[in-house]
């Protein structure tokens, strides 16, 4: 109810794996539809081991609008391609809009995944999503850029305003800021303490929120090019604009500088 009151048009369930809470999803997607909003579930498609199991799952979700299937070479080590294909085919039979997010590190990953799922391109949307930074043996393969050396190449687009709500009720201005726990630079509050419309209204008045929404990651790079941290940042590599924001603004000292910068601008 608070989502609709806040003017939110679409609600997306992510995990973990949301289909583990299938009965709850049935209730939530029904209410979302009643309130005139759009619903999406992001899933690994593990419930599609057979077409029958896929049908049983989707029969419980008649009000679901969109299904985002997230897959990559890593997922396929645990979830067979046929399981993913079953989920796609049954979802199409039930009239769902199907989007497949293929996460990749190298271009070869895209080629491999398209060999498996490319035949669906005329029936679903297939999106290539660059892997976000992570810790692990393959982390060094992620392509990164020295954005401070070429600030004009820094992305200006930002996902701020696509609010992320955790299972505990914490509200963040975007997904990436949910790991910004050192400074809570875009933590908006908690639904158990305040209503969502009030949290969003307060967020729109915060200088940090307004600056990032207007200028995006490119504006953050611009701000720090005039800082005492300029030299150390010149050699740093970032995989995305989101990582720029999270790495710099979740550092207490750099965040303090940033606050002073935007107040003086």
Predicted features, each with a name:
Residues 1, 55, 81-87, 108-114:
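Well-ordered, non-membrane alpha-helical segments in soluble/globular domains
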Residues 2-5, 29-34, 56-64, 86-93:
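Acidic (Asp/Glu)-rich catalytic clusters
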Residues 8-21, 35-52, 61-83, 97-105:
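Core AdoMet radical
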Residues 25-26:
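Short alpha-helix within the catalytic core of nucleotide-sugar-dependent glycosyltransferases
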Residues 54-76, 113-133:
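Structural recognition of alpha->loop->beta junctions
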Residues 69, 169, 196:
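Conserved, mostly hydrophobic/aromatic
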Residues 99, 105-180, 215-230, 239:
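A C-terminal junction/extension of Radical SAM enzymes
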Residues 181-265:
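Flexible mid-to-C-terminal extensions adjoining Fe-S/redox cofactors in radical SAM and related proteins
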